[in-house]
């Protein structure tokens, strides 16, 4: 029974490490892109995100500009 508790604790710590690592690569909404962002606006979204200091950007199905590498 003690081994299961230690295994669970190790699993919980590993999950925190993995989730923390993924957070660094998460996307965030652009703060400067105005208006709806459709598929044909991808280049504009990328440019605005790069101006914000992000690695790139893309338009989502919800018509928002998401910057990558936040």
Curated annotation (Swiss-Prot):
Hemolymph (at protein level). Synthesized in the fat body and is secreted into the blood. In larvae, expressed in the visceral branches and posterior spiracles of the trachea. It comes from the Eukaryota. Induction: By bacterial infection (at protein level). In hemolymph 6 hours after bacterial infection, levels of expression increase for first 24 hours and persist for the following three weeks (at protein level). Up-regulated by septic injury caused by the Gram-positive bacterium M.luteus and the fungus C.albicans, and by M.luteus or E.faecalis-derived peptidoglycans and by B.subtilis or A.oryzae proteases. Up-regulated by Gram-negative bacteria in the respiratory epithelium. Glycans are attached at residue 42. The keyword Flavoprotein does not apply. Pfam families: Gamma-thionin (PF00304). InterPro entries: Scorpion_toxin-like (IPR003614), Scorpion_toxin-like_sf (IPR036574). This is Drosomycin. It comes from Drosophila melanogaster.
């Amino acid at each position: 029974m003690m081994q299961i508790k230690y295994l669970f604790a190790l699993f919980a710590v590993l999950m925190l490490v993995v989730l923390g690592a993924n957070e660094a690569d998460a996307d965030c909404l652009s703060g400067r892109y105005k208006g709806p962002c459709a598929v044909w606006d991808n280049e504009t979204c990328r440019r605005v995100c790069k101006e914000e200091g992000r690695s790139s950007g893309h338009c989502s199905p919800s018509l928002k500009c998401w910057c990558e590498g936040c």
